[in-house]
């Protein structure tokens, strides 16, 4: 029954559970280890779980029909099984049926496979292509038609004693061999075909078909190789065909001889009949003659027909013989070619066999050697094991003796343990007493140590407070790491201590003379990170939000890493930020944390001092904008009021501004540094905070100064503009050194005006500010001279005392101070007007040739009786520029006219009040301290005239040059730089 009929019969079965049980039972019979319950207990879900992955289906098909599955990496196991089943013509199922649908289609498919392959039980090893072709209905019809034509052929009918059914059965197998491929058959098949009886009973046409099938199979293989058994079968078939042809030829000769003998016999009979017919008379003889004649004629007719049929058979046999001869010749040629290929292949196999035999002989020799070694090793191991056995036996005896001795010792120990226990108890009691005493002593020592550490911490705190009260400039030294290409083994820095110690070694001197010792607040080594440097100065920066002015500047020779410390490298990441970025970020974070108590406003200025000119780096004009300096000490530290003030609200905004300023800064390459700063950069962050509870105002300023590096012209090899820049840089740094020296010597006169750099830093170096200097050191031996000079300068800086830093707070008392300052500004404005009136009167008096002394005295008396002075507390509408007139300073104003103006204030300000640093009012008999400079100090509160006419200014200069008596008496007052 075909597979389609089986599937239809299975589908027509009325009991699906019975079909499922049949499938489960068959699967368990094929795969005993399958995790399925017994057939009566198995359900559709159990069967679906076992078949879901498709592995069981593929294993079943491999067992029933090996090679039917195709290796397709893009298809899963279920898809491969379904494709193979579809090629075989078996009822298939869809993937959805196996996943969540009914299992009926799956069961029908498996039952169809069982019906087709169940009788073989998985032992059918035919080629899958043959199964696909021969099991189909068309294939079977083609085979049956071929067999039918062969059985009904004249050749088969002419062979007596042949069982057609047996021949058909045998050559169905031969045809199957052709279709399925002879290489896949078992040895028994070939043995059956080689039997002489099988070939003897086969028709000649079938033998030729087998021969052609073998040749076709050889051609399909495309390698020209025929297995030995097939070659033997082929030779047997050819011999059988030759034998049959020779036998047919003998039969033909015998038939010809027999025909000739029969012809002679018939002719003799005819002659006898003729004689009898002529000699016999009478009716009886005639009747007998007629009967004999009819018989003879019938026999003659039959003979003629037999002869014709025999002639036809002979002609057909001759034709077949000719065809067979041609076929045999072709077969012989093909057989010769096959023999030649077979001989070549045999020769290759013999060569390969010889090589393999040689290799096997070598391997056998190696194995023999290994066997000999193993034998020797076995003998040695046996001897060694025997020796060890004897050794362990002796050791066993010794151990037995030792164990007996130990048992005796244990018994002795048990006896002595009692006495030892008593001794231990006594010792424990003694130890407890000693431990109690040690505990008391340890407690005393611990208390002493705690007091010592407390005293040490207190001493350190007191030392820091003393340094804070003195207002010393903090000095941090940072050692630059070696650059690629520099000799990192020859360093001028010999030792770096944990407490700020630094030892500089002179490469030209050895011993004690070659070392220089320095001590600073902190020394950072070459491997110190930017974050570690910032953490040490973080408390100082945070004091800006408490109202203090803080200045941090970097000093050192060119190429020592000043810009790296202050700004960081180009396109720096957050980890590589310098002090500037980290300080601003920290200020924003703290101001955000304090937003519930204090609101802060932050503004940023960024300038550079290039060739003794101040440039605004944040202005719309870029580096082309030149600015003036304000030398007066302001609470907010605003030294350059005309510079662009940019309010900032976030760190990203500050970074963008600072990057803009950094791009506008003058940079150039020298022989010592590829990115040498050719100007001094000053970044100022102004902080204004207002306490939400008290209403007090805090003002602080953070100055971040990146000084240009000092350089030796012979080493930097600069010319032209770079040489001019280097000269200005060295000049400004020399002026800074003079200021530091004057401050360290506590001189009355400090030369701030010698350089624009010292004028900008005046509020930080000469005011009540917290100042820190980074000293950048190049450890290269070739820069020893510059390094030594830098460290000596830093040592002088560390000895400068600036005084106690003051917080810029404006509370209720601060407002009084501000009002007083406004009144003082109004007074200055009034004095300026009086000076103009004096100039006008002097012009009138000069025209009438009056004496200058009397004119000045009358003017001074008139000024003292001016109603504007008596109503000083009420006159607040004099002008909005009064306060700025007090604070501003003009570098081009005439000093003598300023002296005359300030001296004229003395008799009119005796009734004012002054405020000290704590905001408390006191008697103001010393208000001239705000207007007149002390001896040896610079004047910081000199008024600027409110744009007088040029003619009046010239007159005032001439009149004051004549000097009133009071002016002549005070003309020897010292002025600041």
Curated annotation (Swiss-Prot):
Residues 17-118 form the Calponin-homology (CH) domain. The keyword Nucleotide-binding applies. Residues 1-13 have a biased composition (Low complexity). SMART domains: KISc. One of its GO terms (biological process) is microtubule-based movement. Pfam families: Kinesin (PF00225). InterPro entries: CH_dom (IPR001715), CH_dom_sf (IPR036872), Kinesin-like_fam (IPR027640), Kinesin_motor_dom (IPR001752), Kinesin_motor_dom_sf (IPR036961), P-loop_NTPase (IPR027417). Residues 472-800 form the Kinesin motor domain. One of its GO terms (molecular function) is ATP binding. One of its GO terms (cellular component) is microtubule. Keywords: ATP-binding, Coiled coil, Microtubule, Motor protein, Nucleotide-binding. Residues 1-20, 852-977 are annotated as: Disordered. Residues 861-879, 956-977 have a biased composition (Polar residues). It comes from the Eukaryota. ATP binds at residues 556-563. Residues 297-384, 812-847 form a coiled coil. The keyword Hydrolase does not apply. Belongs to the TRAFAC class myosin-kinesin ATPase superfamily. Kinesin family. KIN-14 subfamily. This is Kinesin-like protein KIN-14D. It comes from Oryza sativa subsp. japonica (Rice). The lineage of its organism: Eukaryota, Viridiplantae, Streptophyta, Embryophyta, Tracheophyta.
């Amino acid at each position: 029954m075909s597979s389609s009929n089986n599937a239809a019969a299975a589908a027509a079965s009325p009991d699906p559970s019975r079909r499922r049980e049949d499938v489960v039972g068959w699967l368990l019979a094929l795969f005993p280890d399958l995790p399925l319950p017994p057939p009566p207990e198995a359900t559709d879900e159990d069967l679906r779980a076992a078949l879901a992955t498709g592995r069981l289906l593929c294993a079943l098909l491999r067992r029933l029909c090996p090679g039917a599955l195709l290796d397709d990496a893009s298809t899963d196991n279920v898809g491969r099984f379904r494709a193979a089943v579809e090629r075989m013509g078996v009822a298939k199922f869809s993937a959805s049926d196996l996943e969540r649908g009914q299992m009926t289609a799956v069961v029908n498919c498996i039952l169809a496979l069982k019906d087709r392959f169940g009788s073989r039980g998985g032992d059918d090893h035919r080629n899958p292509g043959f199964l696909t072709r021969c099991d189909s209905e068309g294939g079977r019809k083609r085979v049956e038609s071929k067999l039918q034509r062969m059985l009904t052929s004249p050749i088969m009918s002419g062979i007596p004693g042949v069982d057609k059914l047996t021949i058909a059965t045998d050559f169905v197998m031969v045809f199957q061999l052709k279709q399925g491929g002879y290489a896949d058959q078992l040895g028994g098949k070939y043995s059956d075909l080689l039997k002489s009886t099988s070939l003897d009973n086969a028709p000649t046409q079938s033998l030729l078909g087998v021969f052609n099938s073998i040749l076709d199979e050889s051609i399909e293989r495309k390698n020209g190789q025929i297995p030995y058994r097939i070659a033997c079968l082929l030779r047997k078939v050819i011999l059988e065909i030759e034998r049959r042809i020779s036998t047919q030829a003998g039969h033909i000769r015998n038939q010809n001889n027999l025909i000739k003998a029969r012809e002679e016999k018939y002719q003799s009979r005819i002659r006898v009949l003729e004689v009898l017919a002529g000699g016999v008379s009478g009716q009886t003889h005639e009747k007998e003659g007629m009967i004999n004649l009819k018989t003879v004629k019938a026999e003659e007719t039959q003979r003629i027909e037999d002869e014709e049929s025999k002639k036809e058979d002979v002609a057909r046999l001759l034709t077949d013989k000719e065809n067979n001869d041609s076929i045999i010749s072709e077969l012989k040629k093909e057989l010769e070619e096959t023999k030649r290929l077979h001989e070549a292949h045999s020769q290759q196999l013999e060569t390969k066999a010889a090589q393999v035999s040689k290799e096997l002989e070598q391997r056998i020799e190696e194995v023999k050697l290994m066997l000999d070694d193993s034998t020797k090793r076995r003998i040695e191991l046996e001897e060694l094991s025997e020796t060890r056995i004897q050794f362990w036996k002796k050791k066993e005896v010794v151990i037995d003796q030792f164990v007996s001795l130990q048992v005796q010792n244990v018994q002795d120990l048990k006896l002595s343990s009692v006495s030892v226990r008593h001794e231990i108890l006594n010792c424990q009691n003694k130890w407890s007493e000693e431990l109690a005493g040690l505990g008391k002593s340890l407690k005393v020592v611990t208390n002493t140590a705690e007091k010592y550490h407390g005293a040490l911490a207190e001493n350190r705190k007191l030392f820091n407070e003393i340094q804070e009260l003195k207002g010393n400039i903090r000095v941090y030294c940072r050692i630059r790491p070696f650059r690629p290409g520099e000799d990192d083994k020859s360093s001028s820095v010999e030792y770096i201590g944990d407490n700020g110690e630094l030892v500089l070694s002179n490469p030209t001197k050895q011993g004690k003379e070659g070392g220089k010792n320095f001590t600073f607040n902190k020394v950072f080594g070459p491997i110190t990170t930017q974050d570690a440097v910032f953490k040490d100065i973080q408390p100082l920066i945070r004091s800006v939000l408490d109202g203090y002015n803080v200045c941090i500047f970097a000093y050192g020779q060119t190429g020592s890493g000043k810009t790296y410390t202050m700004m960081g490298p180009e396109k720096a990441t957050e980890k590589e930020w310098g002090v500037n970025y980290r300080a601003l970020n920290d200020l924003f974070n703290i101001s955000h944390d304090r937003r519930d108590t204090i609101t802060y406003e932050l503004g940023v200025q960024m300038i550079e001092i290039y060739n003794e000119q101040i440039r605004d780096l944040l202005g719309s004009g870029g580096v082309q904008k030149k600015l003036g300096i304000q030398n007066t000490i302001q609470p907010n530290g605003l030294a350059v009021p005309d510079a662009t003030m940019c309010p900032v609200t976030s760190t990203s905004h500050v970074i963008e501004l600072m990057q803009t300023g950094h791009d506008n800064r003058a940079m150039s390459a020298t022989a010592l540094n590829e990115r040498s700063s050719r100007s001094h950069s000053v970044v100022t962050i102004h902080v204004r905070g207002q306490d939400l509870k008290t209403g007090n105002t805090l003002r602080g300023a953070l100055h971040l100064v990146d000084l240009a590096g000092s350089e030796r012209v012979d080493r930097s090899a600069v010319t032209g503009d770079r040489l001019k820049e280097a000269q200005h840089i060295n000049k400004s740094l020399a002026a800074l050194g003079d200021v530091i020296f004057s401050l360290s010597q506590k001189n009355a006169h400090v030369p701030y005006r010698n350089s624009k750099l010292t004028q900008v830093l005046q509020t930080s170096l000469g005011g009540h500010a917290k100042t820190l200097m980074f000293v950048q050191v190049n450890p290269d031996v070739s820069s020893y001279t510059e390094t030594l000079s830098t460290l000596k300068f830093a040592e002088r800086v560390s000895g400068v005392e600036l005084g106690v830093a003051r917080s810029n707070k404006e509370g209720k008392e601060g407002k009084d101070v501000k009002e007083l300052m406004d009144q003082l500004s109004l007074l200055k404005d009034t004095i300026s007007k009086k000076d103009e009136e004096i100039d006008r009167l002097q012009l009138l008096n000069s025209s009438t040739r009056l004496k200058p002394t009397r004119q000045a005295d009358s003017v001074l008396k008139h000024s003292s009786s001016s109603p504007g002075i008596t109503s000083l507390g009420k006159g607040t509408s004099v002008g909005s520029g009064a306060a700025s007139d007090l604070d501003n300073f003009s570098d081009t104003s005439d000093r003598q006219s300023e002296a005359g103006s300030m001296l004229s204030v003395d008799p009119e300000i005796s009734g004012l009040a002054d405020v000290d640093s704590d905001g408390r009012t006191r008697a103001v008999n010393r208000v001239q301290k705000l207007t007149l400079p002390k001896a040896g100090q610079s004047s910081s509160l000199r008024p600027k005239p409110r744009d007088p006419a040029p003619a009046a200014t010239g007159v005032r200069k001439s009149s004051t040059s004549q000097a009133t008596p009071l002016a002549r008496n005070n003309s020897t007052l010292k002025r600041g730089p």
